[in-house]
Amino acid sequence: MHFARDTTRGGTAAHQWHVSRGSGIEGEMNDSSDVSLGFLSAMTTPEMSATIFETIFAADRGRPSETRIAMYDGEGQPGRNDECWCGSGKKYKKCHWQTDERLQELYDKGYEVPTRDILKGPADIEAIKASAAINVGVLDMVAERIAPGVSTEEIDQWIYDYTIEHGGTPADLGYGGFPKSVCTSINDVICHGIPCKEDVLKEGDIVNIDCSTILDGYYSDSSRMFCIGEVSSERRRLVEETKKAVEAGLAAIKPWGLLGDVGAAVHEYAKAQGYSVVREYGGHGCGFEFHEDPFVSFVSEPGEGMVLVPGMTFTIEPMVNAGAPDIDSSDPNGWTVRTADGSDTAQWEVQVLITETGYELLSW
């Protein structure tokens, strides 16, 4: 489900990703199934990561190492030989001490930095991956079954049953009063389409399936686009290019880089294809909570936004319109958002972990 800034509802995207360990894009499009282009995790070497930090932020290696009463996030600093705050069991000096020193300096220089309560430790990351495995499995299952003649109500039941059978809970169900286990957004619906028996998928439709899972208190979130039967070349191109826009955002991820560079890369790619990007909704942190910091804008400027720090987890999920970027949120159900001009729209969502060398896909 997407996250909205300056709107009354939150939310997230939906679609399908197949991870490849090779270079480039893999996958085939099925006439009545999902569009599976796939992509690699873009990585940087530790040396490159260090260079990025030194060049952009000019870290001072001689900073005093005494503990501080309050650091960049208002919390105290552990002693160097104390157990690290992340739960790793390691001594602070062997774990997050250097990260905290960097973040403190960046904060002092005026950069927006993540607070420690959104950075995930090793045990947290493994728990989020377990949740994500269910979320990916749900969407893989939908890819096998979705076809013309299927109602979105049926899809909702599939997703509820699969999630419960695998020990999870659908995060959408009851969230802010949302009545279903998944968001199903067809053609001109940007986000938060509510499944119902009346919405029956037809040949030529494009639909976004946005699925989120809770397992042992940890959250995962991703979505996929599906082409139903034979679709027009215009719709197929919109779906394909929107996914490539997400890939452009992933390629812009650099540890100790800036979040605005990611959103700007997405926006630049989409505009170059003749499309517009929705302004009001974006990605979000996800892991400890369904929606947590940071907000991920896809109309951001390069060189702005939060510093990307290893341990951050968030979604990349632009909503790309074939027409104008304006939205219509007047639906009486209080949730469903459409394009204001009735044009088609597409969205893909992935959940990523920032690592020391690049990123890792968690859910797709």
Give residue ranges: language-model regions:
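Active-site neighborhoods and metal-handling regions in enzymes and metal-associated proteins
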Residues: F3, M48, G79-R80, S88-K94, ...
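Acidic/negatively charged segments and metal-coordination signatures
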Residues: H2-T12, Q16-I25, M29-I118
